Design a protein with these regions (language model features):
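Alpha-helix C-terminal capping segments
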Residues: 142-150, 189
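Domain-level recognition of soluble alpha/beta enzyme cores
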Residues: 171-197
Length: 197
């Protein structure tokens, strides 16, 4: 749960070529594509309007992976801020998909049917070989949420967005895997409520 009075603006990184074909990225470092750079610019313009000169009152933090750090750089540039003046936080890295990283989602029912069925049966607790479950991720991200002391703009990943909403909004853990994770919107979380901007 966010400490009282704190607002979190959460942005998922812009699209990558792997996103475009539904390939699991996890903690594999992949660059933004042209669509992703445009999405990041749109989100930066939105935050510039929303924060309207109050950005000095916010902490800026991103996952250290390439696609998130580059998204934050573009956002900050669009806001008229130093593109590199933000913190990198390992707790905000995407869920580690283990042996599924690099695999295309639509291929998994045929290429790994047993694991695909196990994930479908318990998407919150299922853990890929050499990877993390959503339960593991929720513990990691919960530690980050508890550490927030100021209003914050964060750039991270789809899985992280889901567990952030689980913690802050009380979304049922068994349902978080199905939450929408757009790359062209800013999510505002405050006072236990969300708004897509």
């Amino acid at each position: 749960m966010l400490k009282p009075g704190i607002t979190l603006y959460f942005v998922r990184h812009g699209e990558t070529d792997w996103n475009a074909v539904r390939r699991y990225q996890g903690q594999t470092d992949t660059p933004l594509n042209d669509t992703g750079r445009a999405q990041a610019a749109r989100n930066g313009q939105a935050l510039r309007r929303i924060l309207d000169g109050t950005s000095a009152n916010f902490d800026f933090v991103a996952s250290p992976l390439l696609r998130t750090a580059d998204t934050m750089r573009i956002i900050r540039r669009e806001m008229g801020l130093d593109p590199d003046a933000f913190a990198r936080e390992d707790l905000l890295k995407e869920i580690n998909f283990g042996h599924w990283e690099g695999q295309i989602w639509d291929d998994l029912p045929n290429s790994d049917p047993d694991e695909f069925a196990a994930r479908k049966a318990d998407p919150y607790r299922w853990r890929p070989r050499n990877g993390e479950s959503y339960e593991d991720l929720s513990k990691r991200v919960g530690n980050w949420i508890a550490s927030l002391e100021r209003d914050t703009v964060a750039v991270s990943h789809g899985g992280v967005s889901r567990v952030v909403r689980g913690h802050i909004l009380g979304v049922d853990w068994g349902e978080i895997h199905a939450l929408d994770v757009p790359q062209d919107k800013v999510l505002r979380l405050r006072r236990g409520e969300q708004a897509w901007l």
